[in-house]
């Protein structure tokens, strides 16, 4: 997905699952993992790709000069090894390497890439989606042939399969085969930092975001719990380092009250410890927030969702994220029973709370102004 963010890929996958879950139609996904991604790119393939992409010759020569005659040594417990040449792969740690790798992946798979969200590439994170196992097996076989014929290799143990059995029916064998070997089946997969569950729920991701927030908080507890540091400064540090870790990916959530409450409880525990208070002190949450100048995370989550909604609505009709959001499930009626909560429904509720409608989204400045949640002073 050139020029796209991780959030667009996560959003497309979640929205596709919502639509198929609503119609009770199954989805099958395979998350491809490449062995030693950067170390396996043959140099001749790299030069061939640069030529195919019509990269100017002077730039190709500069890149070749960077890679010619490269030597390295390895530090061991017994000291440094002797120098030895590296004749395969792209340079580790080079800012140019991700771009070169992306060019290689795009060129090698150009003829077999499907449109998003059925096929999404983000660097070396690849997900293939299909309505049937047979179709997914066929796609996986084509990707294996395209990549392994040029020297790359798909991992037989880390490539994973997830079945979204929204129809609740039992089919035949659920194996996805890679080179004669059955790949592992997972109920949950971590994709671009966000946890995707086979039932389309977000409980794992909510728990992971809370844990990520605590990891950041504990790593900075020497500052956040220091009584000599002003509460206002602690609040600024929290808003810069901890809260972003908790909010990553929340704009794509079809969030329920229980999820928002769980996030809010975790945040209040952090803020109380920062100010040196416990619940036994019987100080209201609003007073704690006023001291550190931090708005409720539930409201910041709503701001993030509406900001993301506005971003999507303003995109042109041919944008990947727009077309993916408009995917329809043909020939299937909605199943019986109460419909599951969707991201679109949550957005409608958010707009109702603020008294706004989607006609306002085209005015970006006004939209951002109306949805903004200011931290208390």
Language-model features: locations:
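Short linear motifs embedded in intrinsically disordered, charge-biased segments
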Residues: 57-60, 71-94, 98, 105-377
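Conserved pre-catalytic core of RNA-dependent polymerases
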Residues: 1-98
């Amino acid at each position: 997905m050139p020029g796209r963010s991780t959030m667009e890929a996560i959003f497309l996958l979640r929205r596709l699952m919502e639509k198929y879950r609503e119609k009770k139609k199954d989805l099958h996904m395979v998350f491809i993992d490449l062995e030693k991604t950067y170390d396996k790119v043959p140099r001749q393939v790299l030069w061939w790709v640069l030529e195919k992409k019509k990269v100017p010759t002077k730039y190709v020569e500069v890149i070749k000069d960077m890679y010619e005659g490269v030597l390295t040594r390895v530090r061991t417990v017994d000291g440094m090894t002797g120098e030895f040449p590296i004749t395969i792969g792209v340079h580790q740690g080079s800012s140019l390497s991700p771009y070169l790798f992306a060019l290689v992946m795009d060129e090698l798979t150009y003829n077999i890439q499907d449109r998003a969200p059925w096929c999404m590439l983000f660097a070396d994170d690849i997900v293939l989606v299909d309505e049937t196992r047979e179709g997914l097996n066929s796609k996986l076989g084509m990707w294996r042939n395209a990549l392994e014929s040029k020297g790359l290799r798909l991992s037989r143990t880390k490539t994973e399969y997830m079945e979204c059995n929204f129809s609740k029916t039992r089919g035949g064998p659920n194996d996805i085969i890679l080179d004669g070997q059955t790949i592992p089946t997972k109920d949950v997969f971590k994709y671009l930092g966000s946890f995707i569950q086979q039932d389309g729920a977000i409980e794992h991701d909510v728990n992971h975001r809370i844990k990520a927030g605590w990891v950041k908080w504990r790593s900075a507890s020497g500052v956040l719990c220091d009584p000599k540091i002003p509460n206002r400064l602690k609040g600024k540090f929290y808003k810069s380092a901890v809260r972003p870790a908790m909010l990553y990916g929340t704009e794509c959530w079809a969030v329920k009250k229980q999820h928002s409450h769980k996030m809010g409880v975790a945040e209040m525990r952090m803020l109380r410890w920062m100010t040196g208070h416990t619940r036994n002190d019987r100080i209201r949450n609003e007073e704690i927030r006023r001291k550190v100048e931090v708005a409720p995370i539930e409201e910041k989550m709503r701001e993030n969702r509406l900001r993301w909604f506005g971003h999507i609505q303003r995109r042109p009709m041919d944008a990947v994220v727009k077309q993916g959001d408009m995917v329809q499930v043909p020939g299937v009626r909605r199943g019986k029973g109460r419909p599951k909560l969707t991201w679109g429904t949550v957005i409608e509720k958010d707009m109702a709370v603020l008294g706004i409608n989607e006609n306002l989204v085209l005015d970006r400045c006004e939209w951002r102004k109306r949805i903004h949640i200011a931290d208390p002073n």
